[in-house]
């Protein structure tokens, strides 16, 4: 389930929680992917692009490879939506 949906569809609330989460773990690529999606939902495309770029530039993490792969796939789809 995606972050905004977990919060009743409240993208602004999702942004707040995801930003706090990233302060604790700035390398969490799936949180960044979810944050990018929430930014797109609130028409904050520049900020979404920064998060997308951060996910795509993240070094491989063997410990979290499946999650990182999912995050990359998610942001690639978001990137297409941004154009």
PLM segments and residue spans:
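Short coil/linker segments at helix-helix boundaries
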Residues: 1-23, 50, 59-72
